[in-house]
A protein has these predicted regions:
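Surface-exposed substrate-engagement region within the catalytic domains
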Residues: 55, 60-88, 213-335
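Bacterial N-terminal signal peptides
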Residues: 27-39
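Active-site cleft segment of glycoside hydrolase catalytic domains centered on the general acid/base Glu
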Residues: 138-163, 170-204, 218-220
Length: 343
């Protein structure tokens, strides 16, 4: 069965899907001829020298929605369960979109401990900027700047000084055109604050979100990243929750990296296997899309640290095209992504 999934990278993803029959996972835990041992729950990344993600291990959540879906389907829909296992066995980022006070700190700290105990590298997304998503499908965020700073402080306290990857505020810079001049200045200040606060941890690997290759001109995005404090971060993230091809993302990222003094970037490849849709609202639950390349540091650019699954495949983009509210699990959409994957 391994021949059906000829992965090019050497990212090793093992899984602790204890509730799932191993025969449904076998096709996806054999990577490049290297058999992984069920129970490890992590995956190893190998990459270029100087890359902070090289040699890291990525966490696979044994209780993810995809894992639960595999368990639910394995008796009655075995072929679909096998397809869903592609998602269940692949590392994905963990998102924090709100919360406050001791409960939030405990949530972050508990997850961080669990991942570290698995000898893995936490990959987190912070998505709580005030006026998030300009009030559209993923609208919300902190009530004001004071609340946001407190939230960032709580997160920073919870992760401590351990090594962690943080993707900071998807769409916040690319999408700030909906704000007034004062609102834009406030947003720049808040993201800059987040960068400064998180950078106190010298082991934090920070990437500011830079939209996608089909959104803003490179020169515009470079200016926005600089105002937001990218010089204190590792670099920027591209294509988060979007569908632009890896090739287009790398080309855009290379140009942007050079403008910023040869900084580095990561690309979200979770759902870009067939590129963007050509219809309206192409970014919101487009039909007939596919999973993209699995996480790896074997990229096609010396500036690109990794391809990662930052968006969780199968979570809705919003109430468009028949989808549930943003962030809710949509199993049939997830299944379609897996079925159309090239691997």
């Amino acid at each position: 069965m391994a021949a059906r999934y000829p992965f090019r990278d050497d990212l090793e993803i093992a899984t602790i899907l204890s509730r799932v029959s191993p025969r449904y996972l076998a096709p996806v835990i054999v990577l490049g001829g290297c058999l992984l041992i069920a129970g490890a729950g992590t995956g190893a990344v190998a990459g270029a020298s100087g890359n902070p993600l090289a040699g890291a291990r990525l966490y696979v959540d044994p209780d993810s929605n995809a894992a639960r879906q595999v368990a639910e389907w394995q008796a009655t829909r075995p072929e679909d369960a096998q397809q869903m296992a592609k998602i269940a066995s692949t590392s994905q980022a963990d998102w924090f979109t709100g919360g406050h006070g001791p409960a939030f700190r405990q949530q972050v700290a508990a997850l961080t401990r669990r991942i570290v105990r698995a000898r893995a590298l936490p990959v987190y997304v912070l998505y709580n900027i005030p006026r998030r998503d300009c009030g559209f499908y993923s609208g919300g965020g902190a009530t004001n700047g004071v609340a946001y700073r407190r939230w960032i402080n709580s997160f920073a306290t919870a992760i401590g000084n351990g090594k962690v990857v943080v993707v900071l505020e998807p769409d916040a810079l690319a999408g700030l055109d909906c704000l007034s001049n004062r609102g834009r200045n406030i947003r720049y200040a808040l993201i800059h604050y987040a960068v400064d606060r998180l950078a106190r941890n010298p082991r934090a690997v920070l990437y500011l979100d830079a939209g996608n290759s089909d959104w803003k001109r490179v020169s515009v995005m470079a200016q926005r990243l600089l105002r937001a404090g990218v010089v204190r971060a590792r670099g920027f993230a591209l294509n988060v929750s979007n569908y632009q091809t890896t090739k287009a993302s790398i080309a855009y990222g290379n140009r942007l990296a050079r403008l910023l003094g040869r900084t580095h970037f990561i690309v979200d490849t979770s759902r870009n296997g067939l590129g963007p849709w050509s219809g309206g609202e192409y970014w919101c639950n487009p039909p007939d899309r596919a999973l993209g390349p699995r996480p790896t540091t074997h990229t096609s650019s010396r500036f690109a640290d990794a391809y990662l699954w930052i968006k969780i495949p199968g979570e809705s983009d919003g109430t468009c095209k028949g989808g549930p509210p943003a962030g809710q699990w949509w199993p049939e959409y997830a299944l379609g992504l897996a079925q159309r994957a090239s691997w």
